[in-house]
Amino acid sequence: MRVLVVEDELLIRYAIAETLGLAGHTVIEADNGAAAVRALTNSAEAVDVVMLDYRLPDSNDLTLLAAIRRLSPQSGVILMTAHGTPEVRHGALDLGAYEVMHKPFELHDLEPLLLKAFAASGPSQSTPHTPAGWRP
């Protein structure tokens, strides 16, 4: 499974990426919203699941989640937050996030949640996609 981890805290991003990599997943890392958008638009293969931090240096609302859902509608999205409120949770779910995961969390909880998000994300998982603007 291809997983995009969008997290500005280096140690958290590293721990998630390492855990998922050891579980056999291909992990793409981004430390801000712009890097996440680039990763989604420049990737030759579809991203199956996006693990997205709610508060990033260049995005601290649900705008980035909406952009990710437009760019990669086949990807399951798990929103990670240490500042979760019921409004954030409902807004994220309304925009198509699979789940809102509250920090801190246990790394061993990632794999089952990732698999559920992957299973719920739709039929076009793990298939190549066409980057925006590309024409044969």
Predicted regions and their residues:
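Conserved acidic carboxylate
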Residues: 7
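Two-component/phosphorelay signaling modules centered on CheY-like receiver
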Residues: 10-28
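Acidic, metal-coordinating helix/loop segments flanking the phosphotransfer/catalytic sites
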Residues: 29-49
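Acidic catalytic/metal-coordinating carboxylates
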Residues: 32, 60-63
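Short amphipathic alpha-helix used as the core "switch/output" element in two-component signaling
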Residues: 38, 62-74
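Alpha4 helix (beta4-alpha4-beta5 surface) of REC/receiver domains from two-component response regulators
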Residues: 63, 84-99
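C-terminal output helix
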Residues: 87, 105-115
